[in-house]
Amino acid sequence: MPDGSMYPSGNVSTMRLTGYADLFGVNPGKNIKFYVNCNGPSKYNVQIMKMINGDTNPRGPGLIETPIEAACNGNYSGRRQVINSGSYGYVADKPHFHLESFTMQCWIWPTTPKTHPKYWRHGAQGLMGRWSNDKGYGLFINEQGCLEMRINGETLTTGAPIRDHAWHFVAASYDAATGKATLYHEPQIQYALDPTIEPVEKTISKGIVNEANVPFTVACYTATTDGGALAKSSVPSGIVMRGHFNGKIDSPRLCRAALSRQDIETMKMGANRSMTERRNCGPTGDLAKVVVGSWDFSDGINTITGKDKGPYLYDLDIVNCPTRAMTGYNFTGHNFDWKHAQEE
């Protein structure tokens, strides 16, 4: 139990000391481990008790317990322990992700794109990129539920809310030579009264700052890389992810050049070697030269790996087991067993 003096004044409603054992019970002479979380107190006290009556009903005898002498009794130092929830994919930092120019693209099916102060307070959601603390590049859904590109501390947004539970094709490109950033948001289904979402452009003169040790992420963004104590349980260890995307992502692509809209359309086919008679890893010879990653989530559905069909085979390490074998943007409705139509 924690020392009562270590509670903040007037704030005793929160459980500051929690924990669990690795076993439900042991025989005499066996070992049992306890994992303790101290959210506030710096120390806690351990005392083995003999429970005689644990029923606190006022009609009964109440709680009755007596202390038992044990070598483990005493005071221990404690610290806060965290559980890093949320699923995502990442590739550890590689030189190929240190880009000057880029094009990112993917299909998204958001569940809750907009932050609601009373219901859903998730903040911005990361889609893909290599961005952390106003450095790097990334594609996001911002707090207003609109598509947003980030280059260092600069942002570019369409200003058009993303419809939930629907597929959207999104893409972002940046040309370091001209500073031109372009953002595309194209709903798969365009209803009669829907406004047309035009591509938006912005000139960003300062180039991308590529920090070391920042992984490339899908469905989140990197919050910290300081390797602090609270980050040890994160994956990868020492790096904390935030802004987990709530929804489905399909066919993410990354190229190290600012592609035209026509080339972006061609890249939807991914690293399709059959288009060039298997002479390279792109849908065309020119695009094969700039492909960094082309991930295919239909391959290895029963694994915790996101397969990269690009030239470098940068498979995503998938964390916390996101739901897989979901219907994709190209689902025809003819098959309901994913094993018969994995590409859908």
Show where each model-derived region lies.
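Short beta-strand segments of immunoglobulin-like
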Residues: A21-V26
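Surface-exposed turn/loop modules enriched in turn-prone residues
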Residues: N53-R59
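Beta-strand-rich binding/interaction modules
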Residues: Y44-K50
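Proline/serine/threonine-rich low-complexity linkers at boundaries of modular beta-sandwich domains
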Residues: M1-R16
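Extracellular glycan-associated modules
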Residues: P28-K33, C38-N39, K43, R59-E344
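Short, contiguous strand/loop micro-motifs
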Residues: G19-Y20, T157
